[in-house]
């Protein structure tokens, strides 16, 4: 079936579903055949359905998913979990093995079942060559319908960010909806940027694009009406979602970052034994800006040719052949084009969590170069493990993680009190940033990535230890798994209240 036909089908469903209820699904919910490659086993009458089409990706979003699953199983000892995933090329055993390997999470996996979705391509941007935002939104509606036709849970939890399916969940199955949003699908900043571009260079294409995005924003605002409990992962995301879903109470719940384990493995007395080495832990995807890091590292090496410079290790998971090809492209560019010595730069793909902890324990610096990283679990891991974070001055790393810290009072300070004695890392800006303005004062307050590489490399051992200890204290106070567990339990309490209200209607 062609892409356009699917769009037409989804459009029809969008307008028909609110008017024509489908009683078959309510009946199916009571008498559904519990299945999953051999049959979903019936443990209780309460099923929590986690909609996460890429549950095997191994990134920060998946860490949130699996910690939420673990805590939900503890919260309700009689419940079962259903994971809706499009990872049809992996078996349940393989997915579970990856959870243990990547995140070191153990739970009662006998109560975790998988519903495999055949049409995940509908939410893949590459499927929609034109009108990508609308295509993916329509696709998420269709994928939600597929999920509900295969299995109807008692509660719908979206931990990946497909909000356009929420009306479908309510209309078809009457379920309460809880969402954990990592980033907005579209934001007022994005629209404002197009408005400015259109003012500078007016065109019919620009005008149509602006209308298209504003209409899409209206749709995004509308689907928020179907959310019962809304959670965001950071201050930056929370501020944007509040401006979009104005009638919804938004909670900020920092992702689980396992800071307890990392702080425990980091000994202040062993700091001098750390290698002069920087790590970048991020999925191998272009938006993580590996090319910027490699270029900055090349520039940094050229500046410090006669000095000792830290080594760089790029660590990340690969989800597909496209990701693996991207890694090979980076290697060729770094070693063949930029002539970076192979002994200075190392690539590590699909490492186990134990391997990652080893790199964190022996390294001195941690890098995150993504622009507007909505949160940045890897940055928290750097801080908790005692690394000095070298990060982009935006969103989560700037607003939530690498913040001024008072060690005496063990509390975060306002940015106005930021000094060398309270800093927990170093920040940079780059001319390639989408919001770069040469006249903007904030860009003049930060050096380039190569600049902070040089600054970090020249820090004394005493300075490194002080920054490291402040960062560890901050991370362990704000981002522990235990903190997430308590917050998740409170959210489930609220959801219980919503469930009771919906059930009485």
Curated annotation (Swiss-Prot):
Record field: catalytic activity: an alpha-D-Man-(1->3)-[alpha-D-Man-(1->6)]-beta-D-Man-(1->4)-beta-D-GlcNAc-(1->4)-alpha-D-GlcNAc-diphospho-di-trans,poly-cis-dolichol + 2 GDP-alpha-D-mannose = an alpha-D-Man-(1->2)-alpha-D-Man-(1->2)-alpha-D-Man-(1->3)-[alpha-D-Man-(1->6)]-beta-D-Man-(1->4)-beta-D-GlcNAc-(1->4)-alpha-D-GlcNAc-diphospho-di-trans,poly-cis-dolichol + 2 GDP + 2 H(+)
Annotated TM spans: 5-25
Pfam families reported in the protein's UniProt record: ALG11_N (PF15924), Glycos_transf_1 (PF00534)
Record PANTHER family: GDP-MAN:MAN(3)GLCNAC(2)-PP-DOL ALPHA-1,2-MANNOSYLTRANSFERASE (PTHR45919:SF1)
InterPro entries assigned: ALG11 (IPR038013), ALG11_N (IPR031814), Glyco_trans_1 (IPR001296)
Annotated family: Belongs to the glycosyltransferase group 1 family.
Keywords tagged on the record: Endoplasmic reticulum, Glycosyltransferase, Membrane, Transferase, Transmembrane, Transmembrane helix
Cytoplasmic topological domain: 26-130, 152-374, 396-505
Gene Ontology molecular function, alphabetical: GDP-Man:Man3GlcNAc2-PP-Dol alpha-1,2-mannosyltransferase activity
Protein's organism: Candida glabrata (strain ATCC 2001 / BCRC 20586 / JCM 3761 / NBRC 0622 / NRRL Y-65 / CBS 138) (Yeast)
Protein name, as recorded: GDP-Man:Man(3)GlcNAc(2)-PP-Dol alpha-1,2-mannosyltransferase
EC code(s) of this entry: 2.4.1.131
UniProt subcellular location: Endoplasmic reticulum membrane
Pathway of action: Protein modification; protein glycosylation
Lumenal membrane side: 1-4
Domain of life assignment: Eukaryota
GO biological process: dolichol-linked oligosaccharide biosynthetic process
Any one GO cellular component localisation term in the record: endoplasmic reticulum membrane
Physiological role: GDP-Man:Man(3)GlcNAc(2)-PP-Dol alpha-1,2-mannosyltransferase that operates in the biosynthetic pathway of dolichol-linked oligosaccharides, the glycan precursors employed in protein asparagine (N)-glycosylation. The assembly of dolichol-linked oligosaccharides begins on the cytosolic side of the endoplasmic reticulum membrane and finishes in its lumen. The sequential addition of sugars to dolichol pyrophosphate produces dolichol-linked oligosaccharides containing fourteen sugars, including two GlcNAcs, nine mannoses and three glucoses.
Record membrane topology: Single-pass membrane protein
Intramembrane segments of this protein: 131-151, 375-395
């Amino acid at each position: 079936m062609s892409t356009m036909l699917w769009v037409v089908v989804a459009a029809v469903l969008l307008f028909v579903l609110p008017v024509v209820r489908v009683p078959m699904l309510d009946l199916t919910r009571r008498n559904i055949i519990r299945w999953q490659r051999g049959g979903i086993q019936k443990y209780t009458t309460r099923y929590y359905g986690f909609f996460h089409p890429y549950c095997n990706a191994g990134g920060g979003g998946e860490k949130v998913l699996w910690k939420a699953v673990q805590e939900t199983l503890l919260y309700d000892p009689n419940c079962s979990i259903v994971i809706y995933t499009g990872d049809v090329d992996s078996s349940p055993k393989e997915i579970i093995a990856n959870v243990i390997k990547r995140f070191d999470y153990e739970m009662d996996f006998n109560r975790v079942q998988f519903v495999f979705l055949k049409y995940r391509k509908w939410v893949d941007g590459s499927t929609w060559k034109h009108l990508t935002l609308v295509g993916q939104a329509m696709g998420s509606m269709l994928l939600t319908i597929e999920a509900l036709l295969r299995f109807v849970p008692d509660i719908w939890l979206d931990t990946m960010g497909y909000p356009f399916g929420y009306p479908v969940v309510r209309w078809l199955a009457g379920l309460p909806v809880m969402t954990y949003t990592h980033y907005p699908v579209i934001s007022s900043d994005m629209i404002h940027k197009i408005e400015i571009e259109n003012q500078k260079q007016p065109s019919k294409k620009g005008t149509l694009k602006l209308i298209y995005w504003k209409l899409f924003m209206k749709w995004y605002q509308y689907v928020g009406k179907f959310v019962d409990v809304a959670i965001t992962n950071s201050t930056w995301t929370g501020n944007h979602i509040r401006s979009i879903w104005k009638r919804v109470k938004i909670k900020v719940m920092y992702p689980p970052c396992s800071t307890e384990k990392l702080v425990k493995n980091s000994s202040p007395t062993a700091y001098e034994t750390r290698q002069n080495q920087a790590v970048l832990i991020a999925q191998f995807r272009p938006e993580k800006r590996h090319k910027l890091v490699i270029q900055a590292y090349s520039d940094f090496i050229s500046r410090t040719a006669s000095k000792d410079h830290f080594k760089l290790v790029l660590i990340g998971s690969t989800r597909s052949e496209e990701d693996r090809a991207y890694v090979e492209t980076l290697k060729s560019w770094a070693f063949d084009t930029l002539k970076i010595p192979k002994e200075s730069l190392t690539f590590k793909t699909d490492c186990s969590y134990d391997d990652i902890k080893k790199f964190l324990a022996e390294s001195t610096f941690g890098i995150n170069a993504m622009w507007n990283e909505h949160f940045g679990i890897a940055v928290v891991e750097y801080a908790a493990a005692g690394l000095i974070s070298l990060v982009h001055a935006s969103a989560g790393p700037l607003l939530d993680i690498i913040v001024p810290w008072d060690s005496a009072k063990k509390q975060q300070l306002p940015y106005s009190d930021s000094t060398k004695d309270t800093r927990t890392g170093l920040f940079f800006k780059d001319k390639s940033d989408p919001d770069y303005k040469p006249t903007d004062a904030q860009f003049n307050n930060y050096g380039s990535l190569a600049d902070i590489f040089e600054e970090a490399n020249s820090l004394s051992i005493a300075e490194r230890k002080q920054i490291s200890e402040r960062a560890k204290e901050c991370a362990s106070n704000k981002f522990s798994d235990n903190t997430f567990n308590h917050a998740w339990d409170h959210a489930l309490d609220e959801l219980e209240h919503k469930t009771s209200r919906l059930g009485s209607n």
